[in-house]
């Protein structure tokens, strides 16, 4: 199992700290640092900046929003980032959600699975430097009855295959991820629920004659070290309440649906009700400690070390940590402690 670092969204108030953390992760031998985007900063610019100031660590999008870029533009960006970084780019993609897709990008959120399948196919064709022609439900290249012609990407990526990851939560999207992606970007990953939640992913691999060998399972896992478990969990309540309660509409919140599938249906409804009523403190208080404990790494280094085996046994290959607690020096220490803990566990690869 390898380690990664998720910097989250740029512009959240800790940007200078994130650069320091990325450099420290690079020094410590972390395998990848990820950047996110929603409707603020774009991940590509952030990753270019990080890549220019690091040497070994991979840089990855978690994720580029599919409705925000044409497939050709994504291929151009991926090839450029891979070239500038010396072959260190990982392309993470996601469909976002209805509110952002339709409200920010002006793209209807219909048939997201079909759109994703077509999108990835075009990106792969472009990155392989084939002439890009495609006829699908959402994308047709070149457009018919016009002057357009099939073109070939002029940039030569450093690698023959830039790895493509998909952020997936629902069962059908998980199955698609297994079929067409090289890795899965997970959130609220619980080892206790992994066998059931990952079954569609494994089925997707099997349906196209593939196994899980070489497939990268990459959950983002918040990490807080300390002796008091309740105190360690408290900084993660806002993060959990925001996603379970406030990401998306009442009818279309994929994180809320995931919490329900994990056995927290009553609590997920309460969190959403309170969050949408702007009772944010109440929403945070409604997040069960057990949910936080299952989906994060909290407690003493020894407790975290023991917990790592559950993640490894569940199939995690790259454990991407998020440091949501403490000042900069404490977060740097968290990066170092995770390296020590992983090595002590005997699970490092």
Label the model's feature ranges.
Residues 1-349:
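Active-site-adjacent structural elements that line small-molecule/cofactor binding pockets in enzymes
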């Amino acid at each position: 199992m390898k380690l990664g670092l998720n910097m989250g969204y740029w512009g959240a108030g800790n940007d200078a700290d994130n650069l320091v953390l990325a450099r420290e992760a690079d020094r410590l031998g972390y395998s990848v640092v990820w950047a996110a985007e929603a409707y603020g900063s774009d991940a590509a610019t952030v990753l270019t900046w990080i890549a220019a100031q690091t040497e070994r660590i991979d840089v990855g999008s978690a994720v580029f929003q599919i409705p925000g870029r044409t497939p050709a533009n994504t291929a151009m960006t991926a090839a450029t980032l891979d070239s500038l970084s010396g072959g260190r780019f990982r392309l993470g993609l996601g469909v976002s959600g209805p509110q952002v897709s339709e409200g920010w990008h002006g793209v209807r959120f219909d048939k997201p699975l079909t759109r994703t399948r077509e999108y990835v196919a075009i990106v792969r064709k472009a990155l392989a430097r084939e002439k890009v022609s495609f006829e699908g439900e959402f994308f047709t290249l070149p457009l018919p009855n016009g002057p357009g012609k099939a073109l070939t990407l002029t940039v030569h990526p450093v690698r023959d295959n830039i790895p493509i990851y998909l952020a997936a939560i629902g069962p059908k999207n998980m199955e698609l991820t297994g079929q067409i992606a090289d890795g899965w970007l997970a959130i609220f990953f619980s080892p206790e629920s992994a066998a059931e939640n990952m079954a569609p992913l494994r089925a997707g691999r099997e349906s196209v004659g593939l196994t899980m060998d070489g497939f990268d399972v990459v959950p983002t896992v918040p990490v807080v070290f300390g002796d008091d478990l309740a105190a360690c969990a408290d900084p993660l309540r806002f993060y959990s309440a925001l996603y379970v309660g406030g990401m998306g509409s009442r009818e279309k919140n994929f994180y809320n649906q995931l919490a329900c599938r994990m056995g927290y249906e009553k609590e997920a409804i309460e969190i959403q009700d309170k969050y949408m009523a702007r009772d944010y403190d109440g929403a945070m208080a409604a997040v069960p400690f057990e949910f936080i404990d299952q989906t994060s790494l909290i407690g003493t280094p020894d407790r975290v070390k023991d917990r790592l085996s559950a993640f490894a046994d569940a199939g995690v290959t790259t454990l991407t940590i998020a440091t949501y607690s403490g000042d900069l020096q404490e977060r740097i220490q968290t990066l170092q402690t995770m390296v020590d803990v992983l090595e002590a566990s005997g699970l490092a690869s």
